[in-house]
Structures are given as C-alpha cells and as structure tokens.
C-alpha cells in the first residue's frame, strides 16, 4: 500500500481537483494544498474506519509505510481520537486484501473521489513481439478503480489521474 499511496500522492499533486472537498449544501468546493490521505481500515469484519494521515505528501516511502501501519493499528486497537479519523482529502480503500477483482467503493464525503486497490493476480495477457506477432503470456496484473463525483471533475481527469498512478507504479 505505501507504493500505491506514494504514486497516488504524486497524481493528486498533478490533478488538484481530485484532492478536494465539495459541500453542496454550503456551496463550497475547496481544493486542498496538502494531501491528508484517508486509509480505509477493516476492523476485523465488524466495521470500517477511515484513518487520516495528515500531510501525507510530506512523507517519503519509509515514513508513509510507518504511518499507514501505525494508523491501521491505532484504529484496530480502538485507541484513536477524532483527529485520527477526520480531515482526509482523498481516500484509498485496499479491497485487494480481500481478494477482490473490481470494486466501486463509496466516496468518503466530503472527499470527491476514492481509489480502490484490487488484488494482484496472475492473468493471461497478449504480448506483441518485435516482429509483430502476438502471443499469450502470464503476467501479474493489479487493477485500480476510482469512484468520483462528476459534479467536480469529469472522466477525462479521472482517467489521466489513474494513468499517472499506473505510470508511477510501472516506472
């Protein structure tokens, strides 16, 4: 999850409308200057909480991994305060830990989008060789899905956002 989180933070910087909040009743749309990353944490099938890693964009990979682990443990142990579960600007849901293929999580309001990481599995893919012939090979494939509020940004931004994450993970 730390690698995906770091790639997501990079994409949120590139596409700031995805790192925003929207309150239709108040008529407020805020684009946030920092990434407060929400991490959906399963409470042993007894519920789910979104822990917030404040200013996640200030951490390197090792620091982010440590904060994700600490936040998850805090929530599972029930030793969290309101500040630990509020203020996220974007959420990641790690549904792949439950062996999912494609899910559509519900947006954690007032965020405007949520990323779902699915399980990585071996899948058949078509590979084109240098001479132009196709063959089938087995590769590890992971799926990312994004649910977003179309009132804030359109599908083209969502796809560019996902492609940015994909490029960061592949390179």
What feature does the model see in each segment?
Residues 1-171:
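C-terminal catalytic/motor cores of large multi-domain enzyme assemblies
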